[in-house]
Amino acid sequence: MKNKQSGREFPNRRISGRKPRPEQTKREGTDMEKENIFHRLARQYSKSSLILRILFGMAAGAILGLLIPSASFLSIPGTLFVSALKAIAPILVFVLVISSLANGQTKFDQRFGFVIFEYLFSTFMAAMVAVAFSFLFPVSMALKDAAQVDAVPSGIGEVLENLLVGMFTNPVSAIAGGNYISILFWAVVFGVLMKKLAGEGTRTFFNDLSEILSRTVKGIINLAPFGILGLMYQSISTTGLSIFRDYGLLILLLAGTMLAVALAVNPLIVFLILRRNPYPLIFRCIRESGITAFFTRSSAANIPVNMRLCERLGLDKDMYSVSIPLGATINMDGAAVVITIMTLATTRTLGIRIDLASAVLLSVMSTLAACGTSGVAGGSLLLIPMACSLFGVPADITMQVVGVGFIISVIQDSMETALNSSGDVIFTATAEYRHWKKTGKSLPTFLKGDTKLDI
């Protein structure tokens, strides 16, 4: 055989591959079979209902927490799940808002104003319901030790001042620290300017980056059952059931009030706006947002979950990419309930009589204070002393109340976050569907409309 370039001749050689050994062929076949089984299981896992997987994780975590409370390594998936959500949420919000403003036709139309109205009105109504329940089912507390906490805001002015000053934090520091008021402020500024000044390449980059982050969030949420298992295990193994024995009535009052807000007040608001049966929307939001928020105990960590749910509800991305992180900051029904009930329980314990006018004033203060809980370390609990100051409660007593709050926080904070976070989606969807009705677009099928959604 001649080489075409050199013209030199080489003897013909018969090229033959070495036959694989039987055991090698068998091993490779087994590996491929295992890989195929793994892929099939992964696909089957992803196709199954996320809610059923989460419920299974809850049950498994509770059982393991009761049976083997010393196996602390079982809580690691929960820690990793919450950390992953908290890590990606700030940059997700920042990029999505910029991308929506720079690439879309986003205008801060009446939908945004209406969402803010819904957030504030529902928070005020939650505080009023808390007043009513506190009068109907009065509860006292056994005060023991004062809580060791950082500086408490001296008044509503300081809370609002901290909230506004926080807007002008360095944007990099805001993303690193999860300061969503500042993140939203800078994202809106950058997005508006980018729409006017940036080239097509820059806009495309942010659009692609938002898609990458959204896909990442989808993957994290897909692993939620393992995270919920770890979080449930940690709660049961650490606290057990003794908390219900010592503070059962207070927990029942808080839980009952929050359930009343979630299952009566919020549905009533949705019904008055849409004139449709609100419960299909309410239950979807509680099931797909509230359950996850209950275990993460962080509205910020639940932002990616809520954005994914808004996408499945067919909402405008330009709308929910702003309203959801805004809701995580100012939509605080649960916080208003906690501040109001804990304050009225304190006054009852001390024998201080509260008239109706004072209770309404407390509701207004609780509403304004609740909107500032995202800017206070410790959230709603550290705003209790400020509310108690309305009635002249001594500082050492209020710190004992805060201490009780921290003891029951495993239940209180979980339900508070679930109520707050599910409400973000409920009221965003309500404002969007109201806009659909006004513009002649049919509502989703679960609200007796004709628009079919993949949900």
Predicted regions and their residues:
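Short, Lys/Arg-rich, polar N-terminal cytosolic tail immediately upstream
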Residues: 31-46
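Signature of multi-pass transmembrane helix bundles
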Residues: 42-67, 79-88, 110-280, 441-446, ...
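Membrane-water interface of transmembrane alpha-helices in multipass transporters/channels
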Residues: 73, 109, 241-249, 276-284, ...
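Hydrophobic transmembrane alpha-helical segments of multi-pass transport and channel proteins
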Residues: 84, 120-124, 128, 255-260, ...
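Juxtamembrane helix-boundary/capping and inter-helix hinge elements in multi-pass membrane proteins
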Residues: 101-110, 196-200, 239, 275-278, ...
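Membrane-interface alpha-helices at helix entry/exit sites of multi-pass transporters
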Residues: 109-115, 219-222, 312-328, 357, ...
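Helix-loop-helix junctions within the multi-pass membrane cores of secondary transporters/permeases
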Residues: 288-370, 442, 446, 450
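Transmembrane alpha-helical segments and their short flanking loops
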Residues: 341-455
